[in-house]
A protein has these predicted regions:
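C-terminal and inter-domain tail/linker signature
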Residues: 1-123
């Protein structure tokens, strides 16, 4: 399967909140996830953590995608429902090996999250 198809399958499963199907897109060994607020080196633990996001996910829209070899980049708008709807821009970088995602990196402005959990450095 082409890298873009693997990552698109993962995102579609995430949109449907089908975390079992999303997990099937991730490598069993050597998986890595990095974001401004979390990091995981175990796909099962990562998917368990995504349940919370799924509970508040309202919409996930792809604005742009491109592929370079085994690397796939998506620019996404993610809308969550927390005290009303909030939409944030997120860049997801994925590396595919074989038919599985071995690395995900999410790049986004985490200042709202840090304010929500009471990070005093953000005023």
């Amino acid at each position: 399967m082409e890298p873009l198809a693997v990552v698109e399958n993962y995102l579609e499963a995430f949109r449907r909140r089908d975390f079992e199907a999303a997990r099937a897109c991730l490598a069993d060994r050597g998986f890595e996830y990095i974001s401004p607020i979390a990091s995981f080196d175990d796909a099962d633990v990562f998917i368990s953590g995504m349940d919370g996001v799924g509970a508040i996910l309202h919409r996930l829209e792809t604005r742009l995608r491109f592929v370079e070899g085994n690397d796939v980049c998506h620019v996404l708008d993610i809308t969550v429902s927390m005290d009303g709807y909030q939409t944030s821009r997120l860049v997801q970088l994925a590396r595919v090996k074989g038919d599985r995602i071995v690395r995900l990196e999410a790049i986004f402005d985490a200042s709202d999250f840090h304010r929500m959990i009471g990070d005093p450095s953000l005023g």
